[in-house]
A protein has these predicted regions:
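FAD-dinucleotide binding site
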Residues: 1-380
């Protein structure tokens, strides 16, 4: 459920009852997308635009402007969750599923999940600062060449780099080249552009639990969306365990443009947006900001994967399939969110894919998780 209020650009808070009703409809549209094969829209942007037109035709004219604003806010919400502009996503059933149980906030941050994994490993099992540049596959082993000259020999390699890195580097990273089916999967699956902006204030200007501000632009105000990075922002949310911090969610071309801007411009623009949509000129400037830069980060080159117009029903399966040696043994295994056909784009997909590939090797050596730390170390 969307928490907080949707506001118009003139500072009017839209009735929460109307917002809730539209949000429920929006979730229904999501579920129904791709189910009707006749007259299939070209892409998801067209699909949701058509749905907006349909609901306006059935609604009281006095509610039209607010319905329009709520749907446009939710389109930015959907764009953030998909990973990029909705015009890049085909209007079909992609097989994506929500994991049962809903969202979970991790109070100590995601690093605590890593701690739980490597706290049980031998002290020298994890080597940091070793940027792998080349993976040289031979019949009996694999050599990993690192940036500063180090190299490692292994029987098996689990590749966990992002799809963005694979897209940019797989031809020079892997020798011999990856199988054609895997190269095609790397090309065909989309890789998104998503970022967050954290704004830290000396004193919060909002009431705790009521700080959510979602931007409801009118259709007429979005004609220049492609050239205005901030019009890709879905809204501002409170941050768990950080009572004086808001986070802005942004995706698509706006997320990429954001990375090119100076901090001061980002501070200015976010403050002006909050003042405009809250109709409150007293909203202060943040003390400082922190923002992600996933698109330009050379170790990610984007955010997370999504179905685009080239993605096929077997693309994710082809990406996750291991590369075998001549003895039919798994030599290169692939993990990461983009190798999960059902939960792609999520953190739980990334985590479960790593466990999946570890289990693949355990099964290869006929080990069980209980003795993996002892026996697998001696066999590998």
């Amino acid at each position: 459920r969307v928490q907080g209020h949707v506001y118009t650009s003139t500072g009017q808070a839209i009735d929460p009852g109307l917002t809730d009703n539209i949000f429920k409809l929006f979730l229904q549209w999501e579920d129904e997308e791709g189910s009707d094969k006749s007259g299939l829209p070209a892409n998801s942007q067209v699909y949701f635009t058509q749905k907006l037109k349909e609901i306006l035709e059935k609604s009281d004219i006095k509610d039209h402007l607010h319905i329009e604003c709520v749907v446009n806010a939710l389109i930015n919400y959907e764009q953030f969750h998909r990973g990029d502009h909705l015009s890049l996503s085909p209007s079909i059933d992609t097989g994506y599923e929500e994991i049962p149980g809903g969202n979970v906030k991790v109070p100590k941050g995601m690093i605590s999940i890593l701690h739980s994994l490597y706290d049980n490993l031998p002290a020298d099992a994890v080597r940091l600062g070793q940027e792998a540049c080349q993976v040289l596959r031979r019949d009996q082993d694999v050599e990993i060449m690192c940036k500063f000259g180090e190299s490692y020999i292994a029987d098996h390699v689990i590749v966990t780099c992002s799809l963005g890195v694979l897209k940019a580097c797989h031809m020079k990273m892997f020798q011999p080249p990856l199988p054609e089916s895997k190269q095609q999967a790397i090309k065909d699956i989309g890789f998104g552009r998503v970022n967050k902006i954290f704004l830290k204030y000396k004193v919060p200007f909002w009431v705790e639990g009521n700080g959510g501000v979602y931007l409801g632009w009118k259709n007429a105000e979005l004609s220049d969306k492609d050239s205005k990075w901030y019009k890709h922002i879905f809204g501002f949310d409170e941050v768990m365990n950080n009572p004086n911090v808001l986070v802005a969610w942004i995706s698509g071309a706006g997320a990429e443009e954001l990375e090119k801007l100076e901090d001061q411009e980002v501070k200015e623009t976010c403050t002006q947006l909050l003042r405009q949509f809250l109709k409150d000129p007293s909203v202060p400037y943040p003390q400082e900001i922190l923002r992600s830069q996933w698109v330009s980060n050379p170790h990610t080159l984007g955010s997370y994967s999504y179905w685009n117009h080239d993605t096929k029903s077997n693309s994710y399966h082809n990406l996750l399939s291991p590369v075998l040696n001549s003895a039919n043994e798994p030599q290169l295994c692939f993990a990461g969110e983009a190798t999960n056909p059902t939960y792609y784009s999520t953190m739980h997909a990334a985590r479960s894919s790593g466990l999946r590939e570890a289990e693949r090797l355990l099964q290869f050596y006929r080990l069980t998780p209980k003795n993996q730390l002892g026996e697998i170390d001696s066999k590998l």
